[in-house]
């Protein structure tokens, strides 16, 4: 149902923070909302799929500025070393909320992680996650396409060409998360 899909996206962005973060959970009792973390960035993909189904350019124009703000939020608040590759994190510095942000709450790849403070209400894991950065690279491509539909300027840095190479371990022939301190691979295959 296209209208339901649009309303779901609108509801998600109704709770976008002033910085651009989309909060994890929204409840009928707002005191229960989880504002400690976000979730993987898939919103531009959702909007792109809605557009393909409806050709509703007005919806894209309505949501596009919020999508772009969310995309920029990742690089501003979840890129500890400002190298263009992001980390999952939390607002309050808790490791648990960082795992929630990944959507893989109990993933063993986070077992030896710690938190690094980026800003007043911005913390990152001490590892850059391959899945997060793959999502962000794909979101970049979709935002570029959606900018044409929304008739908006798009000047975001293109990190898509370097993402796969950065996370690929040629010796093991596998994609791994990277430790921030050494940029060595987190040798965990799978979750």
Feature locations, PLM:
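Extended hydrophobic/aromatic segments used for targeting, binding, or gating
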Residues: 21-24, 41, 160-191
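Alpha-helical support elements that line or immediately flank enzyme active sites
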Residues: 1-16, 190-191
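The feature captures the catalytic groove of carbohydrate-active enzymes
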Residues: 19, 23-42, 48-52, 57-61, ...
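Structured ligand/cofactor/substrate-binding pocket environments in proteins
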Residues: 1-3, 62-68
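Active/binding-pocket-proximal capping segment
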Residues: 11-16, 153, 160-162
């Amino acid at each position: 149902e296209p209208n339901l899909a649009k309303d779901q996206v609108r509801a998600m962005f109704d709770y976008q923070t002033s910085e651009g973060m989309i909060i994890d959970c929204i409840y009928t009792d707002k005191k229960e909302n989880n504002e400690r973390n976000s979730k993987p960035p898939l919103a531009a993909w959702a909007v792109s799929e809605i557009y393909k189904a409806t050709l509703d350019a007005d919806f894209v124009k309505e949501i596009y500025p919020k999508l772009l703000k969310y995309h920029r939020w990742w690089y501003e608040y979840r890129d500890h070393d400002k190298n263009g590759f992001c980390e999952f994190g939390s607002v309050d510095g808790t490791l648990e909320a960082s795992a929630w942000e990944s959507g893989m709450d109990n993933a063993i790849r986070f077992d030896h992680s710690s938190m690094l403070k980026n800003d007043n209400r911005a913390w990152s894991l001490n590892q850059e996650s391959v899945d997060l950065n793959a999502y962000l690279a794909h979101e970049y491509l979709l935002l570029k396409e959606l900018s044409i539909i929304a008739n908006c300027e798009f000047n975001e840095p293109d990190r898509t060409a370097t993402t796969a190479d950065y996370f690929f371990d040629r010796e093991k022939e596998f994609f791994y998360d990277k430790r921030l301190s050494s940029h060595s691979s987190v040798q965990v295959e799978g979750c």
